[in-house]
Regions:
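Core catalytic region of metal-dependent phosphoesterases/phosphodiesterases
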Residues: 4-98
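Glycine-rich phosphate-binding loop signature in dinucleotide/nucleotide-binding domains
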Residues: 2, 27-32, 107-108, 147-149
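Acidic, His/Gly-enriched loop-helix segments that form or flank divalent-metal centers
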Residues: 83-98, 102-162
């Protein structure tokens, strides 16, 4: 019997380079075959240049998040612990520029869509409904599912209470 293929997914790193190192070491020790990151590398108390070096060193497949986009376009620099392009090395800037909004990775024999929000919309969210926020149909998610490339995705949801 073939060994199970294990995918580790991390996100919202926010330049926490020390915690990132601990997390990656933990995942590797758990036998994770491939690690992917859903973005938001920027804007945190840690060192973004070091964060990028760690991701590259560990060959982490990464996409951009909204904070990464904001950093590159000089938007929302008022957020707490915002990074600024002028304080980063060129390798970090080039790396952030190279990150796609979405990426399809092969996980074992299955394609997996990696993104920060929903598809190329890095601020889109999906979560179960509550009385204050009912589940809403997402035409963008429907489009992704209708493409048929990700057979594990389903739009079936339940809004009933137990």
């Amino acid at each position: 019997m073939a060994a199970a293929f294990k995918l580790g997914i991390i996100g919202d790193v926010h330049a926490e380079h020390r915690r990132l190192t601990l997390t990656l070491d933990y995942l590797r020790n758990e036998g994770i075959n491939q690690i992917a990151c859903t973005g938001d590398l920027s804007d945190g108390i840690g060192d973004l240049d070091e964060t990028v070096e760690i991701l590259l060193e560990h060959n982490v497949t990464t996409v951009a998040g909204n904070h990464d986009r904001w950093l590159l376009t000089e938007q929302s620099r008022h957020v707490a612990n915002a990074h600024h392009r002028s304080h980063l090395n060129s390798k970090t800037i080039d790396y952030l520029k190279s990150l796609p909004k979405t990426r399809t990775i092969t996980f074992g024999q299955q394609d997996v869509l990696l993104c920060h929000g929903m598809g190329d919309q890095d601020l889109a969210k999906i979560w179960p409904g509550t009385e204050r926020m009912p589940v809403e149909r997402s035409s963008r998610l429907d489009d992704i599912i209708d493409q048929g490339r990700f057979p594990g995705l389903s739009t079936a949801t339940s809004t009933s209470s137990p």
